[in-house]
Amino acid sequence: METTGIVRRRTAERVRDALERLVTERDVWVATAHPDHGPHQVPLWFLWDGHAVWMCTGATSVTARNVRKEPRVRLALPDTFDVLLVQGEAECFPDQEVPGGAAQEFAEKFGWDPRVEEGSFLYLRVVPRTVRAWRGEPELRGRVIMRDGMWLEQRPSLADAPLSDHDPQPEHLNS
């Protein structure tokens, strides 16, 4: 993998970039597992509502069956260089019982409303517990940007902060 010229982003920038991608992107790979049948992965459309990822799948799909048995999932946006992985537990909502405006926002984003289709669909809501983001080898260190459902923020250290005419110089630099 070519990593020459990659500048390692700070945590706050990674969080900003991750949130932007969650708002603007359309597709996510959803990895589930069944205790008896093993792992399963499928691409789905998704909606980020500011707190959770919403997806929709057939009510009898392998994905739906898996999350009913084992709700832990991993989501991955489909860029292998600008990696974004989300881990959480999927909550299941029948298509006519989706809380809030999530189903309507989903329909507006994609021009498709599963609630009016023949057959039954299941909405999956995943509130992130862990998020990892990195671009190439230089960003592997520090790739966790959310832990236990809380976004991490990097506090700038004195060594990282630019000195200006308005900032007092540390005493050891004035000698």
List where the protein language model places each region:
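Charged, gly/pro-rich active-site loop segments
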Residues: 1-10, 82-175
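Short, basic/aromatic recognition patches
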Residues: 2-29
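A generic local structural motif
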Residues: 14-17, 41-42, 60-62, 111
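Alpha-helix boundary recognition
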Residues: 20-24, 68-69, 107
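Short beta-strand segments
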Residues: 25-59, 65-67, 73-78, 85-87
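Short beta-turn/strand-loop junction motif enriched in small, turn-promoting residues
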Residues: 33-35, 72, 111-112, 131
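A short local loop/turn or secondary-structure capping micro-motif enriched for an aromatic residue
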Residues: 49-50, 62-65, 93-94, 141-143
